[in-house]
């Protein structure tokens, strides 16, 4: 008796591929109809899957939104890291930090206005991806300040943790989609002014 082994090819798409397909379709659907107004049933009909099949991969609509949010935040983080790597000094890094967040945030979160629902929900409800993103920005600020103090670009009298917390508070309107929404038209100019303000306060 010959046993037939089922290969990945005969089983069809992998779970990972199907998850990616659901996320891609969801992002397109949310961009047209909004995250808040869309139900899992709506999404299932648009993809051609059953509602139960989608629940096999995601426990809720929020889980799908979290993946989309995490992908967007990863894009911003990658752009930010690339910009910082090209900046020769801590002073330039501060400028790039503010400017890159303003530009990337506007492009990714508001290129499709209805995707703002996801960004807003992630910030308002403290989704894990949003919390992790905030933590990473705080670490970036701290690293820049350390480098600036070591190079004697920045003052060293104020405790480092206090300075980092203050800089992040100034940065937050550009990093938080709920706040960024109110200044889309002036975000780049605002970023330059805020960076200049921070640099004046950091001067030795």
Enumerate the language-model features and the residues they cover.
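All-alpha amphipathic helical-bundle segments outside canonical DNA-binding/catalytic cores
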Residues: 91-92, 128-134, 150-166, 185-189, ...
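Short hydrophobic/aromatic patch on the recognition helix
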Residues: 47-58
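Hydrophobic alpha-helical connector segments
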Residues: 67, 71, 81-107, 160-167
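Short amphipathic alpha-helical elements of helix-turn-helix/winged-helix folds
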Residues: 25-29, 100, 104, 170
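Amphipathic, non-transmembrane alpha-helical scaffold segments
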Residues: 15, 23, 65, 69, ...
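Basic, helix-initiating cap at the start of DNA-binding domains
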Residues: 1-33, 38-49, 63-66
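C-terminal peripheral helix-coil segments that are non-catalytic and often amphipathic
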Residues: 1-7, 103, 139, 143-151, ...
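Short secondary-structure transition hinges
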Residues: 100-142, 150
